[in-house]
Each structure stands twice: as C-alpha cells, then as structure tokens.
Amino acid sequence: MYIGTVLKNIREEQGFSLLEIQKKTGIKESQLCRIESGIRFPTDDQIFILAKFYNIDSNQLQIQRESDKVLEIIKNIPNQRQVLDVAKQKLESNGNYLSVAADSIPGATIPLESRRYIGCKQKLVDWIFDIIKENTSGIKTATDIFAGTGVITKKMLHLYPNVIMNDTLYSNHIIYKAFFGNSEWSKEKITSKLSEYNSLNPKEINDNYFSVNFGGKYFDYDKAKLIGFIREDIENSKSELTEKEYAILLATLIYNIDKTANTLGHFEAYIKKPIKPTPLKLKLIDVQQFSNLQIFQEDSNELARSINSDLVYIDPPYNSRQYSRFYHVYETLVKWDKPVLSGVAMKPPAENMSKYCTSQAPKAFSDLIENLDAKYLAVSYNNTYNSKSGSLRNHITIKQIDEILSRKGNVEKFSWYDDNQEFLFIVKTR
C-alpha cells in the first residue's frame, strides 16, 4: 500500500474531509489531493504534521514514503528482488536506521526506536536535549517519569551518571528490562531459543489462547498460532531463564510481531481487510546493560513522592486515549493471565487506567508537579487541545500547563516548529 493510499484510508477512517484537514493542519487541499492520489510525496514536515493530527507514528509514515521512493527508482531495473536483497545486505546500522532495513541484514539486531507507539518522541529527542543542555547544569540524576518507548531514557543513559525510568504498562516494563536491565544473560542461550522458535511449523501447532482470540484479526492465523505457542513456551521455560533472559525473549517477540500487526500502529482496532500471511522469523533486539539505571512500574504521582532527581522529564498522555487499552494485546501477551476478552477489538477488562486521560488531568498534573523534588523539570506538550476528534482533544490546556508550572519555578517555553503544536517547557524550580 502506497503512502498516499495509507493517508487517504486513515483520513477516511477518522471521518475528515480534505478541506477539514487543510483548515486543521495548514496543508493546502490541492497538495493533500496530490499526495493521496500518488502524484507527489509528502515532505518531512507534512508527514510530521499529519502524523500528529491523526495521532499515528510519523516514523512509520516515513518508512512508507521512503519505500515508495525506492520502488520508484528500481521499477525499470531488471532483477529487482535480487537488487533489493543485495542492497539490504550492504546497509549498515548508522544511528537511528530504519528497522525495515535493519531486519533484513543478517545478524542485525532490532533497535529500541523501531516499535510503533503513539506519541513517540524519537524525532524530537535531539531537539529536546539540546534545549535541556542549554538551560540546565549540574545534572547527576535524571528521571523519565512517563517513559513510554524509552527513547528519552536511552538518551539520558548516555548523558547522566544516574537515571530513573518509570511506566505503568507491563509490556513497557518488560521491554525496559530487556533493552537496559543490568542482570545477567546468555546470548548463546537466547540465540538457541530463537533458532528453535524459527524452525517451528505452524501447521503442526494446535490452536491456542492467542490464535483463538487474535488470529484472523490482528495477525494471520498461522502467525497467531506461532505467537501463542512461543509465549507459552517462554512461560514454561521461566525457571531456566534469568530475569533479563525472560524479558529479552518477550521483548523480542513483541518487536518482531509489531511491524506486521494488522493495525495502524495500535490495537484499538484491526484493519478489516484480508491479512496477507507472512512468516515469523524472530531477530534479537538490541540488548544493552546499564548499571546506572533504576526501572520502576508505579503510578507516576506516587513515585514523585519518593524520588529525588536533578532533572525530571514529563510527558503524560494528554488526551482520552488510554495506553493500556491501545496496547492491550501486548499487555495480555506479557501478563499471560489469559483473561476473557470482549468486543470487536478483543480487549480484556479495563485496568491500569490513567487519570491524565480524563477530566481529572489538570488536578493530577498539578499534584505531580507539586510533589516532585527536582532542580529542573522538562515538560513536553503536544497542542491538540482544540482537535475535532474528542479522543484526541487534550484534557489540559497549554495555559493550564503554564500556570501550574509557574507555581513551581521560573518557566521557559520552546516550540519545535512554526505551527505551535509541539512545546517543551523548562522549569528551574524554586
């Protein structure tokens, strides 16, 4: 599916006309029409603006666009598949390379940044930390209190002597342990396990909890059978694994199935079209170990009362979209308590619901800021308060953010681009 078709499908699914998109984003209707019809490619800025508006992962849109460009270049070249295979083998991981390329390189590991996740700050990391470094000093301990994908923490680990990260999701917590945790692990043992899983034949595997509930919806049936079988085996092998090895296997499973899930990047719904079966070949994630990191899975407002940090980075969910519901498939996969699922999206009973996604958000944010013991606060804010979609509309206005932070100390406000959508507040506390 080409980038224009992807954007058109997303727009139509969310119920917007081209004229409405023009009014909300500033991108001309004529440009949007040419993009959706495949006449032109969207620019980086247009991709970022549209991704923010639709609340989807801009990295995935960029991958779609760049793959379209590659196909355009090679469409008249003979032996296209062989050319692509050789090109993939020549690619080297240079910084934040695209996972779609890295996954095709023999021996390459899957990077932390490659997971599809709403609100991921990967594109903004350098900008965020350039501002932080210019406006702070003497940082010994830094905290990422709503860690999400972990990309902010990853940057902190290379800048500061001590780092604290926190998130309430079970899937995120296990991913942090896998990518960053300092406990022992054997690469040989993990590689052996992955080879074992990659040799499985789905035709020889019986239906299981995962395939019965998610097969034919989020994944093709054969892949769903493999996922369920592998997850059960990881659980049965837990006594033979270290804490980090257990986490690595789970995170590796999540990262490998993430890019082929039949979704728009989250599990609020699946795409109601036939799923093209694809093989499941697990590649290891980019495992690292850090001794200067503490990993928590707590309510951020409660954790705020018990930690002391020179810098706290804050990026809560501002709109109604509950992350525990958007990523319920991964929560179920990690917890493996096999709950009874319901609804079209096959969700478990609601749990781990954030006050920041409700009308209680201003009160929760005020409580958080008041109880943090820190020299500096860095607060990200995406300005979707007046969004047409109720689920996208922020529960805290930028004015409320400013007022609450001003009670804590001296506030500086920075905007990432001219449309005043993405802000970073730096607070030097009193």
Regions found by a protein language model. Give the residues of each.
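A short, Lys/Arg-rich alpha-helix, primarily the initiator
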Residues: 1-13
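Short alpha-helical DNA-recognition segment
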Residues: 15-34
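DNA major-groove recognition helix of helix-turn-helix/homeodomain DNA-binding modules
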Residues: 26, 43-60
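Interfacial/linker helices and their anchor residues that mediate assembly or domain coupling
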Residues: 65-104
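S-adenosyl-L-methionine
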Residues: 98-137, 141, 151-152, 158
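Conserved proline-anchored active-site loop of SAM-dependent methyltransferases
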Residues: 128, 143-156, 165-169, 305-326, ...
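Class I S-adenosyl-L-methionine-dependent methyltransferase module
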Residues: 162, 168-285, 324-359, 363
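Conserved Class I SAM-dependent methyltransferase catalytic core
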Residues: 355-409
